[in-house]
Amino acid sequence: MKQLALVVLMLAATPALAGETAAVADLAWMSGSWAQETPGGTVRETWMPPYDNAMAGMTQTHRQGRPVVTEFSTITAEPAGVTFTAYLKGQPPTPFVLKPGKPGEAVFENLTHDFPQRVIYRQCDVGLCARIEGTIGGKAQGMDWRYRRLP
């Protein structure tokens, strides 16, 4: 009888646990083209809407009217969970796994990476805020972007 009660309890809890599992579609709020302009240049980031458990993104930094850095990224459903993967020229792809969090925020983490160890996106007053953070030489470091949506 105790075993039956345990099985019933586990079956009843299964939908709740499944509901807590993050999906790429939960990050649809990141979709669109975004920009941050500073005296040093412009950073543009674009995310395609989720399709088949995947999103594709591109970030481009412009200085003096010329692109100086272009980075491609994906967000995909992987066995480890929803994963942000950065593709930088001359480097192997770097995966960051989504940590549990609140709606409107996505914290991707890879503690084995040199820098950054976290890539963070959140909805904010200007539109989309992004941050990379981690440690370099034992010292906490970070960079922030405050993107406004492009028409």
What kind of region is each of these model predictions?
Residues 1-4:
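Positively charged n-region of N-terminal signal peptides that target proteins for export
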